Amino acid sequence: MRHRGKVALVTGGSSGIGQAIACRLGREGAKVAIADVAEAGETLALLRESGSEGFGARCDISVPGEVASFVSQVGARLGPPQILVHSAVVQFVRPFEELSLEEWRRTQTVNQESMFHLLKAVLPEMKAGQWGRIIAIASSTFFVGAPAMTHYITSKGALIGLVHGLAAEVGPFGITINAVAPGLTRTKSADATLPGDLFRQVVALQCIKRNGTPEDQAAVVSFLASEEAGFITGQTILADGGQGRT
């Protein structure tokens, strides 16, 4: 049980990659808290089925007060978070010239600014405990590009910069911070919103000739959250089947 006794906070854990991460950490022994604007009942049920302890509440992570309140609730229910995974995301396709300022701001606020609020809330306890694992879910689009997604790519690039910069500040306290950059991943949401031929086109560009799954990303996150990954920090791991290899 790789994460036995640890408390993990996962944003965006009600579905998709976030749900797979929450369930993987739970199966490997962590107590899992899920922060999401959507109902997390399905994920909590999956955690219970696997014998894992979970807690979830609606939380708009773009609002500092809601983040602070949620982290306080997690501390009272499960203990202070030792693992933070930021997976919540605003993602849509829109050409830059058609993008409204409100859409731009919402994307930046949820995808990257919310990480500021989360870190402010969890870092004091991590530093006091001299241990922590922080993982931001970025995107391979920062490396390979994607049409009509400049707003999204910008927000994910900011997370990569945060990881690179903050690693030096938190490292002396036994805390690592890394990013995982998924390639195109087959989720229910992606299936519902993206054309099927896009998946085939991306597979053709990959070294590994299959669609990526949420479980692929969860496996990388689980490793980075473990004791074994204690000497890895400030890094962005591309989990994209080799599409973005350099």
Predicted regions and their residues:
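Substrate-binding pocket helix/loop in short-chain dehydrogenase/reductase
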Residues: P95-F96, E103-R105, A190, V202
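Residue(s) in the substrate-gating loop at a strand-loop-helix junction
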Residues: S139
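Conserved glycine-rich cofactor-binding loop
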Residues: V7, S14-S15
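Alpha-helical segment proximal to the catalytic Tyr-Lys
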Residues: P124, A168-E169, G230
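Short, small/polar-rich loop/turn modules that mediate ligand/substrate recognition or access, typified
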Residues: G171, T176, I232-G234
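Short C-terminal tail/terminal secondary-structure segment
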Residues: V144, S222, T233-T246
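Active-site helix of classical SDR
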Residues: L119, S155, V163
